[in-house]
Amino acid sequence: MSESELQLVARRIRSFPDFPIPGVLFRDISPLLKDPDSFRASIRLLAGHLKSTHGGKIDYIAGLDSRGFLFGPSLAQELGVGCVLIRKRGKLPGPTVSASYSLEYGKAELEIQKDALEPGQKVVIVDDLLATGGTMCAACELLSQLRAEVVECVSLVELTSLKGREKLGPVPFFSLLQYE
């Protein structure tokens, strides 16, 4: 991983204390999205990791609603594979499968179209940030319902103090930037 590219990405992450509630330090990726060089570097770094780890053995990138959609298609293009979308409940047409997960204030559900993947296809799940791991864990469950193989989960940012990586169990996880 090129240190200068990683520094370029890291410099574009802003921190906002006490947002959205007191005691939370929010990591904002908006400056990264505004800067084409930084965004391109983030995609190159994630793709470089996946190429070195999995070679050509990835069939699809699965982007998580909603900020995973910002990285999923570009990452898929860089790898020469397709991209599928995992959406919040009620956002996809046609037959879907769903998985629910807990939020601090209730439950939520993710869905994917039933015909999005074939059994045995190798998939990498991408999101902008891993916090508690609930969303990414639900996405893994969803893809297992389709009998796809989740070969890895990746994100731009990981909030290590929330231990989301542990929720993923045996599924490998990679992040470009780690914050407490």
UniProtKB/Swiss-Prot annotation:
Top-rank taxon, per record: Eukaryota
PROSITE patterns assigned: PUR_PYR_PR_TRANSFER
Phosphotyrosine: modified positions: 60
Biological process, per Gene Ontology: adenine metabolic process; adenine salvage; AMP salvage; cellular response to insulin stimulus; GMP salvage; grooming behavior; IMP salvage; lactation
Pathway(s) of this molecule: Purine metabolism; AMP biosynthesis via salvage pathway; AMP from adenine: step 1/1
GO MF, one annotated term: adenine phosphoribosyltransferase activity
Sequence positions bearing Phosphoserine: 4, 15, 30, 66
Subunit composition and interactions: Homodimer.
Functional description taken from the UniProt entry: Catalyzes a salvage reaction resulting in the formation of AMP, that is energically less costly than de novo synthesis.
Protein name (record): Adenine phosphoribosyltransferase
